[in-house]
Amino acid sequence: MSDTFQRIAPEQARQLRENGAQVVDIRDPQSYALGHISGSRHIDNHSVVDFIAAADLDAPLVVVCYHGNSSQSAAAYFIQQGFSDVYSLDGGFELWRSVYPADTSTGEAE
């Protein structure tokens, strides 16, 4: 089990996602609704406890924010909560959207 997260580029995040990694988006609900990585799950301070309770702590977890800054703190938090394979997306959703515009979706969080 690692006690630190890894910062990764969109290319690595996409490969992890294609191999079944959970992708969580920690941006505000309005930003998520306007655009997010396809298949990602929106979480906030209210839903994080339920997410952790239901999550596979050993499965890869990619954390996404706006530009890759806030996701680092969130990734460290997930490590503290027992996740063993955590990544922070460098450049955040903004870089992802510029690199993979076809791999984005819009709409409210489920």
UniProtKB/Swiss-Prot annotation:
This is Thiosulfate sulfurtransferase GlpE. PANTHER family: FAD-DEPENDENT OXIDOREDUCTASE, THIOSULFATE SULFURTRANSFERASE GLPE. It is found in: Cytoplasm. Keywords: Cytoplasm, Transferase. Residues 17-105 form the Rhodanese domain. It is an enzyme of class 2 (transferase). It catalyses: thiosulfate + hydrogen cyanide = thiocyanate + sulfite + 2 H(+); thiosulfate + [thioredoxin]-dithiol = [thioredoxin]-disulfide + hydrogen sulfide + sulfite + 2 H(+). One of its GO terms (biological process) is glycerol metabolic process. Belongs to the GlpE family.
